[in-house]
């Protein structure tokens, strides 16, 4: 770095980050009246410049670059004193009205205007205009030559100046005093104001770097269409800029190829608002390149992407497009750490290294994976493309650092140091934004930070939270290969361990968080982003989303599928057997349909936890029956270690049955609670055909020799009932479980029955009262149905020639009305929360509240009334927890539907109403429709 030697001289110096005051001058004591620019008197430099220009107007041009006339700062005069212009040889020339343009009269004499200078032939264009001896010239010489090349494209109402690092009072500061500059005369006052300012060149406490200091420290350009978008601490010359009507501002770092760090800062200010400074940045880069300088530290090597990376970017773009359309988001960006090796190629101001000058990881947007839903935000996208972020900057950098979704209700509140794009966000009126770090199963440990900007009109905290929840839900449905990153992966990377990342490794995903961040004097607390494991929870996509998500590369779908399936082995699947299929699919980064296909490939026909959940629901029913028997004081418990029901349930020492006519009045028992911590392999059918021991209930604690022992064996069906046998002579018979689970009362066979051909059972009246006294409506109906069937069988034995359905004297006909009455009253007595029913028939949908305790038939009546259909002339299907349509044909099915809703924490049931084929039969001259039976 060219660092002038400080010396004592009253002149251009000042305080860091403020206006300059009387102190030691950083330059030598030589008397210089061209803004103390001594090199201008060097014969070699003068010869180079005259040979460069080779024109009578050269004397005029020479007066345009060094500071003009006797410096007010050096001479002790005020800013309002007229400036005298000097040529390169120290001769005074008349000051034109605008320094940047040649007087028209003079242009006629010379035959050239400022726009024609150097445009006659190729020898006066581009880098050929600069002598080859610039390599040995000082930095100031080369900047002077670069300004001469840049002046043609500058236009009017602009000031270009260079900030150089100097030492002052033990600090390294940036100063433009005595440095080359270009200006329009109308901005001469602002030039003199700038000469009085110095800015810190290092991050030191208590020192404000200002715009030049920020660019010097970060090594990347910074620009704005209007300085009004800066806060006053971010642009320390704000009051002076407004006084001189400054609007546009551009600051670029200058690198010497022989040095690794920034050696100067180029600043350009204009009186016009400019949408961007792309053209000016390109012109500055070309001018610097001609004098062996550059405005970027890295190279312009084009990056190439693998096929898997292209797949990932394609899916990300599809996801962003769908979400922006579904939720009316104006913009969504994809940030990529450069360490991925997939940055977006060379852009001015982007250094090619993976780390910034401060040593932090940097992230850049990948433009092909960004989506602009509002055309007005295209300018913000271009601003992001010109500026990288460091890890921890902005919400995208914070999401990368914290590994959790990060939300800010107003990104404009950030300071420019915390969020280098804050002034652009203020320009485009962007408010809330959320960022989440994801990875793809196709690209291993490559990180992608998706940043979503909420609509400008979405400002309330409640409205923002609702939108975040909806956004999370949408991502769960449409993401395929994308998944969140679990902490173990980040810990391994931070610890420097060289562990190979497995694409489909199990992940411990966070469930939401509240993130707080302080920036400057502001403290922004991020609201919880509900269900942050959104990236791996795909499901059935809604029709409107399916239309929006149009994969750009359908031809690669098969390859994507095989890649995901190929990496999921049986050992990996076993680790997820204890949870639901959806949770496993989320953790593995595949959709449930794909996971089902993988299971079938490994010989697994049904997801194990589905069976376990059904067993648990059946155990509730069994427990109700067991508890209804007098003297049973233990509850069923499922032991996941053995796959059996291990707790022992004992009967009283003396359990006697008075006769075949009845049983003791039972007590209403409690249902066993569902075990949520079931292990993975228990109760599962494995591919090797080995069948693990299913649930068994062992009832022991034999006290006396005549005690009865109950065993509930295993069954292969999904529902289990109880069927225990006992004999009075202590001989115990073990019976299988009732495969349908419909009859849960205990049937005891004994030798003391009056009728040896019949089973020992209680009277119908006491048993019916016992059934009605229970809590579960579905169990009531099932048990009563079975009871009526057995009663009908008994009546058939007693009256073999009489039909129980037609002969009222047989007692069967009288029992049927009793069944209906008791069932309805029992169902009404059972208190249960109301369900929200959404029934669809021929494209029409109705919605209403329904109490499950009212029963299945009442549900039919409600639906028939709303669709004006004959009751029972249609079939119902409900959507279960595996997104499958299951027939709802009786109260047992209704209870199963309620259990499924409870397991997933929902109170909304979706029904499909379908017409049933009518069976036409005739009896005599009449014709009637025989509808499908709806009883249990």
Curated annotation (Swiss-Prot):
Ranges annotated as biased composition (Polar residues): 688-697, 770-781, 816-825
Name of a matching Pfam family: GAF_NLP
GO cellular component terms, A-Z: nucleus
Start and end residues of each stretch annotated as Disordered: 99-130, 666-697, 753-782, 794-827
Residue ranges of every copy of the PB1 domain listed in the record: 834-916
Main location: nucleus
GO molecular function terms listed in the Swiss-Prot or TrEMBL record: DNA binding; DNA-binding transcription factor activity
Superkingdom per UniProt: Eukaryota
Biased composition (Low complexity): 754-769, 801-815
SMART domains: PB1
Gene3D superfamilies in UniProt: Phosphatidylinositol 3-kinase Catalytic Subunit, Chain A, domain 1
Regions of compositional bias (Basic and acidic residues) in chain numbering: 671-682
Keywords, ordered alphabetically: DNA-binding, Nucleus, Transcription, Transcription regulation
Occurrences of domain RWP-RK (ranges): 550-635
InterPro entries attached to this UniProt entry: NLP, NLP1-9_GAF, PB1-like, PB1_dom, RWP-RK_dom
Subcellular location: Nucleus
Function of the molecule: Probable transcription factor.
Name of this chain's protein: Protein NLP2
